Amino acid sequence: HSRCALWISDAEHAPLTPISGYPDLDIRWPAHAIIGTKGFDFIDGLDEATYDYQVFKGIEADKHPYGACYHDLKDTLSTGAIEYLRCHGITTVICGGLATDYCVKNTVLQLKAAGFDVILNKAACRGIAPETIASAMQEMAAAGVKFVECAKELAE
């Protein structure tokens, strides 16, 4: 994300408080995944040079999209992820990430809406709060998402 993002919480604006006046912002968040910081980098063990396609989302100061498939909250400005997957004949996507109850949930639901089979690796996810995680898991299950506890289950 941008260091100048309008959604970053501060002493006057607590995290998770509403923002108005910007169509692609809804609530404030602590600064995270800022370009040029460790939080923006791939985790150890994932070599970005081995990937054919990377999505950079939320780098604009006035946007904080949750899903990886669109740059906006209305799901109209594509990141190209859906098109890339379709072009390469991919029909199943395995997901994980941060945060289960926001970005992961929205990405998974965007992929399901686009017609993909989606598997959520629960061990590869972390969320914000138990209540919102539970709600997100229910919403994803209702959409037909499959769940595995860990990657080993995928090999079985």
Short names for language-model regions:
Residues 99-103:
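Gly/Ser/Thr-rich loops at beta-strand to alpha-helix junctions
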Residues 1-92:
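Active-site alpha/beta core segments
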Residues 94-97, 116-130:
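A short glycine-rich beta-strand->turn/loop micro-motif centered on a GG-aromatic cluster
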Residues 28-30, 41-53, 131-156:
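Structural recognition of alpha->loop->beta junctions
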Residues 104-113:
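Histidine-anchored nucleotide/phosphate-binding helix
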Residues 90, 116, 145:
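Short phosphate-binding/catalytic loops that engage adenosine nucleotides
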